[in-house]
């Protein structure tokens, strides 16, 4: 029996953000929805609308603030009164008609900098005064990057699916410290990196390429886990050397009445650091292939996750 809570939002979504009190923020094309825990009912929600524009990216900021990137602006919003009302804190024009690649915008250095993913590299912005940002530098790269994870205060990992490489980048200078070749990424548009522990980072591979593990201290690839015809679109650390991945699994997992339906599912992994082994210990319920999917999130102080697929949001206990 499927134990997941399923919220049918009947519209495409792009990104989920966990809030305090286990409330859930959902980025749509031109609005943001805030659903209240524990029921996540669509009858009692906070809506933040952006008429006549499109939300190009979103990320959490400090103290219950969120940052929204539109075509031309950065907008900082504060959520108030237990996430039931909001106010616009700042609104600034940054780069006219600049869209983010894969809608990627992440916070760096404990919410003091922003990274904006561009078509040919990335931009770093400083918070020069509260909730006002200025350009620090642009880092150009011919093929651009797909996913990012900050591994130290001044060091970043990112990948380029076009080049089949993972890069370690020094953010101070900035420059590429080293790169690792032959890393095959099939769907680079979601969060394909995650920490496994303080020293190990995982990266989801393409339809046949499973999961890669990297030691961030030696900046080397240390493990390649493969499973026939299984690739991963999004990964998330869930603590204690455990992580989950959204697996594209063809017809291998889950159940469907339609023999032509291809399925996704959540796979659960544990990393054995002594033997450098990845062990799959659970496979979740299947769900139908969806063109639009989101990142995984884990709620603060609760043992449950959420994700979006095919116009539905799923909330699941771990």
Task: Go through each PLM region and give its residues.
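A short beta-strand motif characteristic of beta-propeller blades
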Residues: 2-8, 43-49, 84-96, 131-139, ...
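Beta-strand-rich domains and repeat architectures in extracellular enzymes and scaffolds
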Residues: 7-30
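Repeated scaffold domains used in trafficking and secretory/extracellular systems
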Residues: 11-17, 52-61, 95-106, 141-151, ...
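Short coil/turn segments that connect the beta-strands within blades of beta-propeller domains
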Residues: 21-23, 63-64, 111-112, 153-154, ...
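Residue-level signature of beta-propeller blades and closely related beta-rich strand-turn architectures
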Residues: 30, 72, 120, 162, ...
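Short loop/turn segments that connect beta-strands within beta-propeller blades
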Residues: 37-40, 79-82, 127-130, 171-174, ...
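Short, conserved, GDST-rich strand-edge loop motifs in beta-rich repeat architectures
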Residues: 247-263
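Blade-level signature of beta-propeller repeat domains, shared across WD40, Kelch, NHL, RCC1
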Residues: 291-318
């Amino acid at each position: 029996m499927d134990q997941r809570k399923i919220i049918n939002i009947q519209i495409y979504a792009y990104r989920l953000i966990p809030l305090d009190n286990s409330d859930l923020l959902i980025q749509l094309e031109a609005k943001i929805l805030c659903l209240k825990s524990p029921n996540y009912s669509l009858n009692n929600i906070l809506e933040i609308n952006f008429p006549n524009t499109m939300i190009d990216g979103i990320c959490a900021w400090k103290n219950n603030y969120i940052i929204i990137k539109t075509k031309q602006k950065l907008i900082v919003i504060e959520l108030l009164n237990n996430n039931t009302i909001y106010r616009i804190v700042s609104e600034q024009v940054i780069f006219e008609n600049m869209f983010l690649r894969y809608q990627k915008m992440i916070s760096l250095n404990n919410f003091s900098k922003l990274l904006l993913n561009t078509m040919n590299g990335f931009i770093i912005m400083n918070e020069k005064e509260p909730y006002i940002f200025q350009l620090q530098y642009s880092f150009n790269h011919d093929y651009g990057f797909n996913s990012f994870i900050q591994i130290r205060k001044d060091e970043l990992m990112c990948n380029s699916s076009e080049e089949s490489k993972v890069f370690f980048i020094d953010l101070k200078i900035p420059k590429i410290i080293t790169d690792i070749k032959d890393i095959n990424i099939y769907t680079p548009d979601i969060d394909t990196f995650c920490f496994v522990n303080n020293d190990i980072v995982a990266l989801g591979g393409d339809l046949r390429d499973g999961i890669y593990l990297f030691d961030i201290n030696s900046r080397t690839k240390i493990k390649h886990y493969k499973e026939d015809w299984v690739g991963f679109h999004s990964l998330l650390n869930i603590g204690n050397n455990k992580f989950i991945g959204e697996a594209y699994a063809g017809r291998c997992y889950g159940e469907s009445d339609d023999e032509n339906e291809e399925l996704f599912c959540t796979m659960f992994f544990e990393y054995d650091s002594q033997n450098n082994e990845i062990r799959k210990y659970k496979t979740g319920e299947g769900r139908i292939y969806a063109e639009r999917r989101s990142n995984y999130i884990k709620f603060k102080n609760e043992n449950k996750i959420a994700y979006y697929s095919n116009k539905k949001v799923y909330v699941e206990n771990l």
